[in-house]
C-alpha cells in the first residue's frame, strides 16, 4: 500500500488489509468498520489506536497532511497498529483504495 499510493509510514507494519473504511467519528468506526480494514481519518490523537485495536483494524491512514501525535505513535507501536500518512485527501485515497480492490 505504501508505495502504490504514495503513503509514508509513521509506524511500520505489515498487517493484512481486506476492507476499507473512512470516518472521523470514533463511535461510528467502532460500530461499522469490518475487521482487517484500513481506516482513513484525519484524527491524530491516541484514541484512534484504542479504536483500531478494539475493532481489529489492520492499519490507519491519516489523511490531508495531518500527523499523529507522539502519544499516538507510542500507543501504535505498543499495540502493533501501523499508521501511515498522506497529503492526499480522504476522498482521493478512498477512491484509490477502492479501485485497487479494497472495498
Regions found by a protein language model. Name each.
Residues 1-2, 69:
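A diffuse structural propensity rather than consistent per-protein peaks
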Amino acid at each position: 500500500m505504501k508505495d502504490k499510493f504514495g503513503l509514508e509510514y509513521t509506524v511500520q507494519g505489515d498487517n493484512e488489509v481486506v476492507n476499507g473504511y473512512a470516518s472521523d467519528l470514533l463511535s461510528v468506526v467502532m460500530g461499522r468498520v469490518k475487521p482487517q480494514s484500513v481506516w482513513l481519518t484525519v484524527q491524530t490523537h491516541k484514541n484512534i489506536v484504542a479504536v483500531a485495536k478494539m475493532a481489529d483494524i489492520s492499519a490507519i491512514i491519516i489523511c490531508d497532511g495531518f500527523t499523529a501525535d507522539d502519544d499516538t505513535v507510542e500507543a501504535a507501536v505498543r499495540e502493533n497498529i501501523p499508521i501511515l500518512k498522506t497529503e492526499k485527501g480522504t476522498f482521493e485515497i478512498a477512491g484509490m483504495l477502492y479501485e485497487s480492490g479494497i472495498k
